[in-house]
Every structure is written in structure tokens, then in C-alpha cells.
């Protein structure tokens, strides 16, 4: 992260790639597969050069709201309309501005929001700060585990176009010790 200035690379792209790697690992570890029409439970918004931070926050907020609306419109969500245990996922958003990572959430539960409800600010981390590498990584992993748990809850309800792979999906034929 701190080498981005030496390498003349934008930190947003590096951070986005690493977040996606963490999420891919969590999905693989949980043996999750996705339909073509599956609804992601997270959004990543790297800051654009020349764009204001407020516009980035608004864009991420709109993306999270669009995911929640897409989930609400999903026909499979209405199958359990009379069920009190209907699952409304919490969508997680990552806003990346330079070395700063901001985590936001938005609930798909219509009881938790109104038309003017915005995403909730969870936390902000300076990934370029010396001595905070372990703590920042831990915070990111905890957030990714929350995303994974949300996906697993959707699998249990048969929602969101996510399902669990049958059998062993490890490429080398080994068995997964976690299962």
C-alpha cells in the first residue's frame, strides 16, 4: 500500500483488487456458487480521479440502494412473504479514496428504512498508516466474513441466486477439513 507512490500506481485499484481476493477466498471456502442472475451483497466503489468524495459516497449509496431494490423485486423474495423469518440482507459497501477505506451498509428490510434513508457509515481505515497493517487487515476480514455469513443465510433460504456446491470442489481432490 505504501509503495503505491513509488510504483506510481493508484492505491484504489490495489485495495479494490485485494478486497475482491478476500471475498473470492470467502466464497470458495464456503463452497458457494452463483446463478447468472444472482444478486451481489456488496459493492466496491474506487474513487475516480477528479471526482469529489461526496459524489463517491452518493454513488456507493445509490449502488447499495439499487442492490436492495433488486433484492426486493426478486420474485424469490416473495415466496416467503407470509413467513416472519424472511431474510432481508444487509448490503455492504466499500468506498476507496486513496489509502482510505470506508465501509458502509444498507439494509434491504423495508421496515428499517424510508425513501430518504441513506446508507449507514460503519468505519473508516487509513490503509497507508504505519503500524496499523494487522488491525486494518483484521477489520477487512471481519467485514468479508459478515458478507460471507449473509451469503450463507441467503443460501439457507434459497434466495439471491446463491447456492452451495455439492460434493468436493477443491481442485486437487483433497477434502475440506472445515466441513
Can you annotate each of these PLM segments?
Residues 1-92, 99-100, 108-113, 117-179:
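A short, conserved, highly charged catalytic patch centered on acidic carboxylates
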